[in-house]
Amino acid sequence: MKILLTNDDGVHSPGLAALIKKVSEVAEVVVVAPDREQSAVSHALTLHHPLRAARIGANVFSVEGTPTDCVNLGIHSLLSYRPDLVISGVNRGANIADDVTYSGTVAAALEATLMGIPAIAVSLVTRSAGEHFEAAAACAAKLAVTVHQKGLPRDTYLNVNVPDLPAESLLPPLITCQGKRSYEGTIVDKVDPRGRNYYWIGTTDLSFEDIPGTDYHAVSRGHVSISPLHIDLTNHASIEMLKSWELP
């Protein structure tokens, strides 16, 4: 099995280092990852300037670009073969509920899926530096073997979130759906020493709806959450209702 690894925390992140270590035990690994942190870039693709890549290890490439760039460049140029699987992570911080729409980690898995390659995004549920990246990486490695053996439904990729706990303390994985988060955005508005305004986009304390069966419900109770995500964003349940509208 040959696996392409990437992330959005950057090529030198501890989560990626843990993933390399654990996945290398079950597969041949090549890393194509951003040269710096690219958190919250979602599915951004670099189109207005050239991409540059540097080989910084035997099978490790650092790219001046987004996670989506890395998957594109890896599959279409840097690798001499088509990987059997793409794994993105281990992200520092959860990618659950509505946050998946912002996530560069999840978007890298989406990009691989668009190319017809099975993919997994894996994140460590923590608001601090994170302690148990290896436990999350071990979960990803085990799941990679299962996905390689069984395959995934068409246009489907997996979003995995692992509580920041020692491996022996993790509860069994649960198959979940995407949850819901309540956003109360804030803008930090300041003035620099030259009298110019500058801003930071921030949020107040975040809250999630604790709904049984969701990713948040699982991880908040110590379970590993595995959510099957899909390329098709259509709300199929609303189609018939919208057809009844008197559209202009």
Swiss-Prot record:
Highest taxon of the lineage: Bacteria
The UniProt record lists the keyword Disulfide bond: no
Residues annotated to bind a divalent metal cation: 8-9, 39, 91
Primary residence: cytoplasm
Catalytic reaction equation(s): a ribonucleoside 5'-phosphate + H2O = a ribonucleoside + phosphate
EC number assigned by the record: 3.1.3.5
Catalytic class of the enzyme: hydrolase
Transmembrane segments: none
Localization terms from the record: Cytoplasm
Cofactor(s) listed: a divalent metal cation
GO terms, molecular function: 3'-nucleotidase activity; 5'-nucleotidase activity; exopolyphosphatase activity; metal ion binding; nucleotide binding
Gene Ontology terms: cellular component: cytoplasm
UniProt cofactor note: Binds 1 divalent metal cation per subunit.
Keywords recorded for this protein, A-Z: Cytoplasm, Hydrolase, Metal-binding, Nucleotide-binding
Keyword Metal-binding set for record: yes
InterPro entries, sorted: SurE, SurE-like_Pase/nucleotidase, SurE-like_sf
Role of this protein: Nucleotidase that shows phosphatase activity on nucleoside 5'-monophosphates.
Family: Belongs to the SurE nucleotidase family.
Name this polypeptide is given: 5'-nucleotidase SurE
Organism: Citrifermentans bemidjiense (strain ATCC BAA-1014 / DSM 16622 / JCM 12645 / Bem) (Geobacter bemidjiensis)
Phylogenetic lineage: Bacteria, Pseudomonadati, Thermodesulfobacteriota, Desulfuromonadia, Geobacterales
Encoding gene, per UniProt annotation: surE
